[in-house]
């Protein structure tokens, strides 16, 4: 049996999405900026995409900017807004557990003279609103907080954060990295006081290399690339029409059975975690065992620390059995360094190199979960014995 449980890294493309993209690439392949019929046919896909995504978010079509994915969207939001608003102030706020696309961009902005406050999180990976309130200064211009953490699945109180920011200073911009949240939660930027929001297609069964950035109509932001002036001069470059069409169809398909699929994912998550706790020396991160509330976390992510077994050893042992997981964020997995998220939640040092991530999708079945648990029941005691002998 082959079991893919690394859906926070990327998801399998819906077959219908692949079919549509093939049609766009082979038949409707015109440049959307061209004036002839082929160009106008391609442009229709972009118009339809903006209309569709705007309806899902309850925003205006002109507030959707297509990008190459989450990293570009994050960079565009942070650098573009920081540079455009620096006369009002040079203070930025984020958290200690953001995606590298946020943290590394913040580090870059620090070299450009900006001050950055990194908010701590509790053991469940959530910020405290009191810490945010204390951190906001007269020269704060932007706050960036992720919707769902990609490593442990912690869920931030985004609506409450947005309300707090706007109550303290309506001019502070609020950016949300929703790469792991879009398609798992119904997100309405205007209702939640979100000014900018990053989304990536390949986390919702769409193609890689495409995403979008929601930019509120009143947001002042500079472009970070220059060229032909596409997308109202905010993101130059010929639009990825097949990718945009595929992403839009994927989003539509995700929303068709939204509540049903999310209920299924939460049921699988609860079932899996109960199975994990039947083994000795196991710890699920981002949850408090005595007061488990699965709905206060993302439905698709489970971070597990396995006492006495290194994460890379377990990852490859499971791979040999056809089970594919992650030892952390795939976006930074090629770097042998300890996860900042695991440090921030206060995970014991002995677990830093013994933590793995399972992440589910609408394709995940209970049979796959049972197979994974049974393999782990047999495998982990043997790996621990081998580790002790060494």
Per-segment meaning from a language model:
Residues 1-390:
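Pyridoxal 5′-phosphate
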């Amino acid at each position: 049996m082959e079991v893919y449980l690394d859906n926070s890294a990327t998801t399998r493309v819906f077959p219908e999405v692949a079919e549509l993209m093939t049609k766009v690439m082979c038949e409707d392949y015109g440049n959307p900026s061209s004036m002839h019929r082929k160009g106008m046919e391609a442009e229709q896909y972009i118009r339809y995409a903006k209309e569709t995504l705007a309806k899902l978010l309850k925003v205006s079509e002109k507030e959707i900017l297509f990008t190459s994915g989450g990293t570009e969207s994050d960079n565009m939001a942070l650098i573009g807004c920081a540079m455009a608003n620096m006369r009002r102030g040079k203070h930025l706020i984020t958290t200690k557990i953001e995606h590298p696309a946020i943290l590394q961009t913040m580090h870059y902005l620090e070299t450009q003279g900006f001050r950055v406050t990194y908010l701590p999180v509790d053991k469940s990976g959530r910020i405290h609103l009191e810490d945010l309130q204390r951190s906001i200064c007269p020269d704060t211009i932007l706050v960036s907080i992720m919707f769902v953490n990609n490593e442990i699945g912690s869920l931030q109180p985004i609506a409450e954060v947005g309300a707090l920011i706007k109550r303290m200073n309506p001019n502070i911009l609020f950016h949300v990295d929703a790469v792991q949240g879009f398609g798992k939660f119904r997100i309405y930027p205007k209702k939640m006081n979100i000014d900018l929001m990053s989304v990536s297609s390949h986390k919702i069964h769409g193609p890689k290399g495409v995403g979008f950035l929601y930019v509120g109509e009143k947001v002042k932001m500079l472009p970070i690339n220059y060229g032909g002036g596409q997308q109202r001069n905010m993101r130059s470059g010929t639009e990825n029409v097949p990718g945009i069409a595929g992403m839009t169809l994927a989003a539509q398909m995700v929303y068709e059975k939204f509540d049903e699929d999310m209920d299924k994912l939460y049921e699988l998550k609860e079932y899996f975690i109960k199975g994990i706790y039947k083994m000795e020396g196991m710890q699920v991160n981002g949850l408090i065992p005595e007061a488990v509330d699965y709905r206060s976390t993302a439905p698709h992510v489970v971070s597990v620390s396995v006492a006495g077994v290194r994460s890379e050893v377990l990852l490859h042992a499971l791979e040999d059995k056809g089970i594919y997981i992650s030892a952390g964020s795939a976006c930074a997995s090629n770097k042998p360094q300890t996860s900042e998220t695991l440090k921030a939640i206060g995970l014991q040092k002995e677990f830093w190199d013994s933590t793995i991530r399972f992440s589910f999708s609408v394709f995940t079945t209970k049979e796959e979960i049972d197979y994974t648990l049974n393999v782990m029941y047999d495998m982990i005691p043997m790996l621990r014995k081998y580790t002790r002998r060494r």
